[in-house]
A protein has these predicted regions:
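Membrane/wall-proximal cationic-aromatic binding patches
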Residues: 39-159, 283, 369-383
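Generic structural signal for small/hydrophobic residues in well-ordered secondary structure
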Residues: 28, 139, 178, 193, ...
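Short, amphipathic alpha-helical "lid/cap" segments that border enzyme active or binding sites
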Residues: 175, 179, 298, 302, ...
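Loop/turn elements at helix/coil->beta-strand transitions in domains of secreted/extracellular proteins
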Residues: 162-164, 188-193, 313-320, 358-360
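Serine-dependent acyl-ester chemistry module
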Residues: 40, 198-352, 360, 365-371
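Hydrophobic membrane-insertion alpha-helices, especially the h-region
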Residues: 11-28
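Conserved SGNH/GDSL esterase-like catalytic core that processes O-acyl groups on lipids
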Residues: 134, 143-226
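Histidine-centered active-site loop/cap adjacent to the catalytic His
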Residues: 31-35, 261, 361, 382-407
Length: 407
């Protein structure tokens, strides 16, 4: 009788434990399904619902279609892919392939392309033959994502200011890569240097960049340079290797599957959700990792900014900091505790305070755009994509031009 009772208790306990595991993994599966739908897939759903034409080709499909049509002059944008592509090479590349028809991106339903300049940036090549009145540095928001060149911030600023605008923006750049890009390609005399800070990812990008020795050396050695202006043939060859690796990797899909599977087995999303929802009272993950920032990361950022301002001062240039809020900041459906981009908005007061203490010129885009009394989400493709649409980029260019005229 006693043995029977013990067996029954063990059986019940086993059922409870198994049920708990099943419930937890079902919850992880629910969160995975909820968060795995990409912005692209969501945009396509909205486009279909509103009967808006949408080019559903991925960048890989677009590129391979061009290769099939023997259009070898078309290349995908590379930029910082050198940091994530497993190539045994210590080369540094800050742009795309020079003088090429470049596949950019698609957020509004159509693919955008541009003819890269002599150094691989998104400019008319003639900008390099004139005085550099205005120099833009930043990530994809500056690069021109994802609109035609004439509708980008740089394109509209050329139109409004009637000045020569050099766009050194590149997708996925963080603050350190922007600093390096300025030192390699933008250190001209008597320019207006405009640095764009992207609230959604710049601090996280900086924390990743600072770990790369070939990037960190630019901060450690004041006069260090790779003289990339004189190595275009070399960097073009490196960029081509990156493209061949990324777009012909037959094991990429399997690698992504393994990565997602490990994510699932570790209950990553469930642990993250519970940790953030309880403000760390139930601590299943390091909450600092989820925040993506701490006192140290801000100190790194401020140190980099000081060095960048010092570099511009050496060239008798005027430095302007542009604070770009994340789209998620305006989306009421995004929970600040669960979204890293929205969470990063909590850093803003400290950043603005630093700028004011250091007497650094700055433009707060949220403050300026709010004066327009418009629905901010209307400035983003389908109200969900990461970059400003052409109307949003035009407004940003107007704001910057007005600020410059008041200097």
């Amino acid at each position: 009788m006693k043995k029977f009772y013990i067996k029954k208790v063990i059986s019940y306990i086993s059922i409870i434990i198994i049920s708990m595991f099943i419930t937890i993994y079902m919850y992880e599966f629910y969160l995975s399904s909820k968060f795995l739908i990409s912005q692209r897939e969501h945009a396509i759903q909205i486009a279909n619902k509103n009967k808006i034409a949408y080019d559903k080709r991925t960048k890989l499909e677009n590129y391979k279609e061009n290769l099939k049509n023997k259009n070898s002059s078309v290349v995908p944008v590379t930029g910082t892919d050198f940091l994530t592509t497993n190539i045994d090479n210590n080369e540094l590349i800050l742009s795309g392939i020079s003088n090429s028809h470049t596949i950019f991106c698609n957020e509004s339903g159509y693919w955008t392309y541009y003819e890269s300049d002599r150094f691989g940036f998104n400019n008319p090549d003639s900008v390099w033959d004139k005085s550099k009145d205005i120099i833009l540095i930043g990530d994809s928001n500056v690069h021109g994502g994802c609109v035609k060149r004439k509708n980008s911030i740089a394109g509209k600023l050329r139109l409004f200011s009637k000045k020569n605008v050099l766009n050194l923006g590149m997708s996925s750049n963080g603050p350190l890569l922007n600093f390096i890009t300025y030192k390699e390609f933008g250190n001209y005399e008597n320019s207006i240097v405009i640095f764009f800070y992207s609230e959604e990812n710049d601090i996280g990008d900086l924390l990743s960049e600072i770990k790369v020795d070939r990037l960190n050396v630019y901060l450690e050695k004041e006069n260090f340079t790779n003289n990339l202006k004189f190595k275009v043939d070399q960097t073009d060859m490196f960029a081509q290797k990156i493209i061949e690796k990324r777009y012909n990797d037959k094991n990429k899909s399997f690698s992504n599957f393994i990565k997602d599977f490990k994510y699932f087995i570790k209950l990553t999303r469930a642990r993250k959700y519970i940790t953030l929802r309880t403000n760390g009272k139930i601590k299943l993950m390091n909450i600092q990792d989820l925040k993506q920032h701490d006192t140290k990361s801000l100190a790194l950022f401020f140190n980099l900014l000081n060095k960048l301002v010092l570099e511009t001062n050496k060239k008798d240039s005027t430095f302007i900091f542009v604070y770009k809020p994340s789209r998620e900041f305006y989306d009421k459906n995004v929970n600040i505790k669960l979204n890293r981009s929205k969470f990063n908005s909590e850093l803003k007061p400290e950043i603005i305070n630093f700028l004011e203490k250091q007497n650094i010129n700055y433009i707060d885009l949220h403050k300026e755009l709010s004066k327009r009394k418009i629905d901010m989400l209307d400035l983003y493709p389908f109200r969900i994509r990461s970059h400003f649409n052409k109307e949003g980029q035009e407004l940003v260019a107007e704001i910057i031009n007005r600020y410059i005229n008041q200097l």
